[in-house]
């Protein structure tokens, strides 16, 4: 509640819609409060009943149950020395340096709490399962988890490619997820219809309707600048190159990220 009170009292730094700037943590508390007020449930209960339980995922929720904590992979600060730019960048994005961010995310108190934009614990398989559900128009094993219209509207672009004033890189957003771009974007080359999210340092999860794939890359090595960057770029390149595009009539559903589809708008 104290976080919400601080956010309610915060003054805008620019008129709404003037600048593109990702809210890594703060916006989650506002959206989380909206969900709680509309549904009358806390976020854990809502996610459990809406997604986690019907998709048979034992851990896909905010925080981590005590019985799974011995199995969790802890984060580790890696890459070039943080003072060579990483700390300055993460202070700008998160409000704290690399080691502080790593220490906070490894703390059992972080696993106890609900951080609406920052602490879903899951596995790569379960994250991939979630994006497969989105690719299937919200359907999973005969159960309709989300409506096709919800997914379509969530993937409608809200911006073109612009420099994000928080992340300081070219970004493109939909109403819900981050979007890929052509000729190259967050999820690799020619991923203009892909949608997903960038997590805390070297975590990428997305679905690409053009290629009929979902991808989940979860890493514990936390760095911004390091020798991993060429390999990461090559991985994204190879996924785009090796996974061929499929004809539109073979896709599982309609998505707002496809500029040719306007039937549900």
Located regions from the model:
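Short, small/polar residue-rich loop motifs at catalytic or cofactor-binding pockets
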Residues: 199-201
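Solvent-exposed loop/turn segments at secondary-structure junctions
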Residues: 28, 222-223
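Composition- and surface-driven signal marking solvent-exposed, interaction-prone regions
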Residues: 42, 133, 146-147, 217-219, ...
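Short, well-ordered beta-strand elements
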Residues: 205-206, 212-221
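Short, surface-exposed loop or secondary-structure junction motifs
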Residues: 1-189
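C-terminal helical cap and adjacent loop that interface with cofactors, partners, or active-site loops
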Residues: 128, 132, 211, 236-239
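Short, gly/Ser/Thr-rich active-site loops of penicillin-recognizing serine hydrolases
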Residues: 136-139, 150, 155-163, 224-265
């Amino acid at each position: 509640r104290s976080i919400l009170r601080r956010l309610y009292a915060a003054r805008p730094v620019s008129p709404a819609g003037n600048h593109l700037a990702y809210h890594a943590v703060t916006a989650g508390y506002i959206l989380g409060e909206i969900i709680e007020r509309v549904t009358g449930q806390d976020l854990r209960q809502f996610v459990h009943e809406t997604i986690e339980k019907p998709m048979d995922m034992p851990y896909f929720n905010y925080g981590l149950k005590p019985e799974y904590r011995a199995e969790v992979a802890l984060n580790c600060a890696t890459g070039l020395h943080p003072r060579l730019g990483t700390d300055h960048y993460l202070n700008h994005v998160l409000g704290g340096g690399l080691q502080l961010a790593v220490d906070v995310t490894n703390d059992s108190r972080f696993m106890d709490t609900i951080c609406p934009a920052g602490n879903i614990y899951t596995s790569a398989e379960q994250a991939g399962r979630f994006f497969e559900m989105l690719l299937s128009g919200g359907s999973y094993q005969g159960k309709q988890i989300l409506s096709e219209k919800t997914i379509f509207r969530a993937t409608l672009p809200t911006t073109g490619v612009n420099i994000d004033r928080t992340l300081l890189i070219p970004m493109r957003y939909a109403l819900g997820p981050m979007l890929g771009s052509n000729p190259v974007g967050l999820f690799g080359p020619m991923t203009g219809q892909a949608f997903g999210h960038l997590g805390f340092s070297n975590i990428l999860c997305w679905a690409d309707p053009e290629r009929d794939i979902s991808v989940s890359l979860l890493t514990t090595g936390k760095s911004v600048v390091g020798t991993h960057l060429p390999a990461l770029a090559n991985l994204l390149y190879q996924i785009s190159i090796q996974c061929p595009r499929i004809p539109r009539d073979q896709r599982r559903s309609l998505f707002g990220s496809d500029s040719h589809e306007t039937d549900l708008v």
